[in-house]
């Protein structure tokens, strides 16, 4: 499938056998691809043991991994932490939602929780497996007018949705209280030298020290060197404290991210000094060390050894905190430069007296080609696979060729689709002159387009569609060029990690894209042009009990239902019914408006338009229940009232009667937003909007129940025959 091929080529996930990794880059891939929430580092710890097995590593009861080389003085300890921030399940609600406690509870940026809202996650089971889940997020459609909108930063408003309907469903899946939870794994190449993704700042030290261990295994260097991969660094440095108590080294080098000097900021009211730029080399965090032997740029940071219970550990006089510059730290789009990793590795090898490892990092990155189209199906395609194909196609408003072509390929061979001047894909049954009914779903999705290229290599973006900036800023992105796809990150402004910052409520606030370039010329060298479009990566995940989650279910579910209905109607269906897959809905129903106007001018306005689009469900703990919920798993929804239309009550009842006749589960309700059918009303048509319940609309965590999709396809088929 499209996303699977993309993920193998561009979104780099964990490799199956850590021991095979031989370069810093290859180590980095599986290290970042392994979840290791503080206190739950077991899987990563064991992979490190496997990677080091030829060197006789030791592993203690809390997962610290150590390996020693050489003999005599001085005794150097070079340590790095392997844990990452995350959450642990603290309670399971009767309706299947998970409540969580954060690990660590303090010390993270003020908006850390908010940036997890409406994002894909991985939750661990008792058996050590990982299951997909999402964090609940507020929908922009239901927020206007609310007096007390839940604070997205407050962990009391954090709910995890794994698709379960009951506590028993959760427990049957293997998830329980104490299950760890962390962001879904992805590592993205950005430009020729940068990597971006979750836990980048928590794993680069391990990638460096694995290389150092291999060099020492070949040539031990001078004195004694102990390399340690320590756990629970976010929990008052418990792993490092234990190793220090055991080793009593003469010198200590800690390799890892820096912490902001929070106490100093509180005293002075100042912001912490910015780190050196990416690509400028290794850095010394905190107090510089002339004894280390390599010059490093110094940057202030809080001490890496955090005091817990008991007396403080006395560090040797010769102690250094070494690292690399990080951009957007502690976010899903956290970024570093592999040239800095090389510089740090060379410095460490010089320090211990072993051979320098030549860089094996790739000097350039090419765009990932778009996959070849799938073959046309010879029989009715599976509804879930149809949905996967359509959701994993990318098509921002105004650039919808990919999903339109995907729909066309999925249609049966006996139909003859046409495309109008607005880009709408049309299938006509009957004589086609004046259809009695039009069914319409839109092909576009939220995203951005490149508005301009700045002198510093950043890209100014135009927003296409509406959604919360907190769901997109600071997250990995894909830039779609004429040659293929490039990795990028939707940039965060300076000061995003301070309490003064707040995400804007309006998605139309301009966003910026980081493509790993330092100038406009470097952008041009990557093949990027004004007008290229940008999306957030996506992959359809199957959750518990028949539910799925992926961005762009709005409105690829509607598109899927119509594809299924066309197949079900068959080649001998001759009623005057038209199916339209419309464009630019997210920009104001523009494709639908063009079709409606053209139909009116031709005297072909239909009597009824069935606009098929999302019912933004309040079936979540975060939304106001003054709306009829539109519960997942209980059938399609007659979208009786929204921001653009009121369906005549008699038509609501008529749809429900046809549904009941065919035992199709049906609901009706009130929601927000607009629908394509509203553009036909001025010309005399009745807009009868059909929907399915969707949680977390306009976010990366959109979530549905496949039973509702089947019900939607069934009612479209039935209405085509009987309305």
What are the functions of these language-model segments?
Residues 18-723:
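N-terminal hydrophobic/helix-forming segments and targeting peptides
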Residues 5-16:
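Bacterial N-terminal signal peptides
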């Amino acid at each position: 499938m499209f996303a699977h091929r993309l993920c193998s080529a561009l979104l780099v996930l964990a490799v199956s056998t850590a021991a095979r990794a031989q370069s810093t880059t290859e180590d980095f891939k599986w290290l970042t691809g392994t979840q290791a929430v503080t206190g739950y580092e077991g899987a990563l710890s064991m992979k490190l043991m496997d990677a080091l097995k030829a060197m006789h590593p030791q592993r203690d009861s809390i997962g610290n991994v150590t390996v020693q080389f050489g003999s005599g003085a001085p005794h150097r300890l070079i340590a790095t932490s392997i844990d990452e921030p995350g959450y642990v399940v603290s309670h399971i609600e009767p309706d299947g939602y998970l409540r969580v406690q954060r690990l660590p509870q303090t010390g993270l940026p003020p908006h850390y929780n908010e940036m997890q809202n409406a994002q894909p996650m991985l939750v661990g089971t008792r058996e050590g497996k990982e299951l997909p889940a999402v964090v609940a997020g507020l929908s922009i459609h239901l927020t206007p007018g609310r007096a007390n909108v839940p604070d997205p930063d407050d962990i009391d408003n954090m709910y995890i949705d794994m698709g379960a309907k009951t506590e028993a469903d959760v427990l049957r899946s293997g998830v329980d209280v104490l299950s760890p939870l962390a962001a879904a794994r992805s590592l993205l190449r950005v430009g020729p030298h940068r990597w971006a993704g979750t836990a980048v700042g928590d794993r680069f030290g391990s990638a460096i020290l694995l290389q150092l261990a291999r060099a020492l295994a070949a040539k031990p260097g001078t004195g004694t060197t102990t390399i340690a991969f320590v756990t629970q660094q976010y929990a008052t440095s418990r792993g490092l404290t234990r190793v220090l108590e055991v080793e009593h080294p003469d010198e200590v080098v800690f390799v890892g991210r820096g912490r902001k000097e929070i106490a100093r900021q509180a005293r002075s009211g100042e912001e912490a000094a910015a780190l050196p730029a990416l690509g400028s080399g290794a850095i010394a965090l905190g107090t510089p060390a002339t004894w280390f032997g390599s010059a490093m740029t110094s940057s202030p940071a809080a001490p890496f050894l955090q005091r817990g219970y008991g007396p403080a550990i006395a560090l040797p006089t010769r102690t250094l905190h070494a690292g690399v510059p990080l951009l957007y730290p502690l976010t899903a789009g956290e970024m570093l430069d592999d040239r800095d990793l090389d510089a740090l590795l060379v410095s460490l090898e010089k320090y211990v007296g072993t051979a320098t490892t030549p860089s094996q990092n790739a000097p350039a990155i090419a765009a990932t080609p778009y996959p070849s189209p799938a073959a046309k199906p010879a029989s009715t395609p599976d509804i879930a696979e149809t949905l996967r194909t359509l959701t994993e196609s990318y098509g921002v408003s105004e650039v919808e060729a990919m999903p339109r072509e995907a729909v066309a390929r999925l249609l049966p061979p006996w139909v003859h689709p046409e495309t109008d001047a607005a880009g709408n894909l049309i299938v006509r049954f009957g004589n086609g002159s004046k259809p009695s009914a039009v069914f319409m779903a839109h092909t576009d999705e939220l995203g951005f387009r490149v508005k301009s290229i700045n002198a510093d290599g950043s890209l100014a973006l135009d927003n296409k569609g509406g959604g919360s900036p907190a769901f997109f800023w600071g997250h990995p992105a894909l830039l779609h060029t004429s040659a293929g796809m490039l990795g990028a990150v939707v940039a965060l402004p300076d000061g995003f990690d301070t309490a003064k910052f707040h995400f804007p409520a309006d998605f139309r606030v301009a966003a910026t894209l980081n493509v790993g370039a330092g100038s406009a010329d470097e952008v041009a060298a990557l093949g990027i042009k004004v007008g290229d479009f940008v999306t957030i990566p996506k992959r359809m995940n199957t959750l518990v009990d028949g539910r799925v989650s992926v961005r762009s279910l709005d409105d690829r579910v509607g598109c899927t239902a119509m594809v299924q209905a066309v197949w079900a109607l068959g080649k001998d269906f001759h009623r005057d019914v038209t199916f339209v897959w419309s464009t630019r809905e997210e920009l104001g129903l523009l494709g639908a408006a063009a079709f409606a106007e053209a139909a009116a001018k031709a005297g072909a306005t239909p009597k009824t338009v069935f606009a098929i689009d999302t019912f933004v469900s309040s079936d979540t703990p975060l939304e106001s229940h003054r709306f009829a919920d539109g519960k997942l798993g209980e059938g399609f929804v007659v979208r009786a009232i929204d921001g653009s239309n009121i369906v005549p009550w008699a038509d609501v009842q008529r749809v429900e009667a046809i549904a009941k006749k065919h035992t199709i589960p049906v609901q009706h309700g009130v929601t927000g937003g607009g629908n394509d059918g509203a553009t036909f009303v001025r010309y005399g048509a009745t807009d009868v909007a059909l929907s399915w319940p969707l949680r977390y609309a306009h976010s990366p965590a959109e979530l549905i129940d496949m039973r509702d999709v089947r019900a939607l396809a069934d009612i479209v088929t039935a209405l085509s025959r009987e309305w």
